[in-house]
Amino acid sequence: MSLLTEVETPIRNEWGCRCNDSSDPLVVAASIIGILHLILWILDHLFFKCIYRFFKHGLKRGPSTEGVPESMREEYRKEQQSAVDADDSHFVSIELE
């Protein structure tokens, strides 16, 4: 029996499914794939920003500091922190020289 033509019918005062092939491996595989698809769809819609940012930028956190002297790195960190600390509004304006 096809899944599209499956009908629930009242059987002895209960609702039951009149299909005998529910143990068919194809039906089991389709059910597992459907459940996995639903779980992945929900996770994608909950965490899409994190997921796509990870795939786009990898594990990097900010600009590369490779080849930059430690003093300049520390100065940049201080500027970033002071810009965040000094501003109470939602927008921060940072001018780079």
UniProtKB/Swiss-Prot annotation:
Q: Where is this region: Disordered?
A: 60-88
Q: Where is the composition biased (Basic and acidic residues)?
A: 71-80
Regulation affecting activity: The M2 protein from most influenza A strains is inhibited by amantadine and rimantadine, resulting in viral uncoating incapacity. Emergence of amantadine-resistant variants is usually rapid.
Q: How does it assemble?
A: Homotetramer; composed of two disulfide-linked dimers held together by non-covalent interactions. May interact with matrix protein 1.
**What does the sequence similarity comment in the record state about its family?**
Belongs to the influenza viruses matrix protein M2 family.
Q: What is known of its domains?
A: Cytoplasmic tail plays an important role in virion assembly and morphogenesis.
Q: What is this protein called?
A: Matrix protein 2
Per the UniProt entry, what species is this protein from, by scientific name? Influenza A virus (strain A/Ann Arbor/6/1960 H2N2)
